[in-house]
Amino acid sequence: MTAHKILANRLIKFFANMTKMLSYGFHALLPNKRFTLPERSGALIKGKDRPVPRIIWQTNFTNKVTLPVYLNYLFNRILSPTFAYRFMITEARADFISANYSPEIFNAYSRLQIGAAQADFWRLLVLQKYGGVYLDIDAHAVWPLGYTIKPEHEELYIIRQKNELTNYFIASKPDNANLARLIRQVMQNIEEDTIAGVYDMTGPGVFNQVLDYQNIPTTFYRITCNQGSFTNEHFQYIDKPQGKWTKEQYKVDVVRKTPPES
């Protein structure tokens, strides 16, 4: 039943790696060339309404991206034409949370000093408000999302080896009780500030702490959504001196020790 999806995953990886290698030459010739990710874009084909809205959500520190990141975006759009697209940069994330959530939640979010931790929290909040499918900026679908997410799904999470939940793909209806639980746990983690790393403070560690994979709808990542096929750390953070969050968290506290002054 899943053999065709596994084959598709391998073919996508092969194609994506070819484009990634060619992109080194492209950016060697045009080192300053960047492509713009749209703030919003409609679905290419109209699809029937479902509990999980047909919207792909992404975020990044900038909307000006290298060729591999842009190709990753285009691939998702082509593979899932019945889904609209929404994108927010760092400043837009803060504006969204300020406009749609309580001062308590906004102040907690504002204490996060690393972009990846902010993005972890934002994805929960934007899905809780509007619903849809969150994808990391380097994540791509393996199979059309309209087929992966069934009409009966109200939420869907991916698991990796050893049944570990992760958060680079999340599909959810608005007002999801499980997302509410995750949001409360992130709030508690920020308030207590006893966790050193992003992974357990705001990321997949929270999912594995709060949710039981046996009691929620899950799908295996290799037949659903993968990361890093089209792009890599070099192309993602070429314009960010701080580098990837895995390095930044050793230089900057994840949580600001005192709330920012109003």
Which role does the model predict for each range below?
Residues 1-119, 135-262:
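Glycosyltransferase-associated regions of secretory-pathway enzymes
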Residues 120-131:
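Small-residue hinge/turn detector
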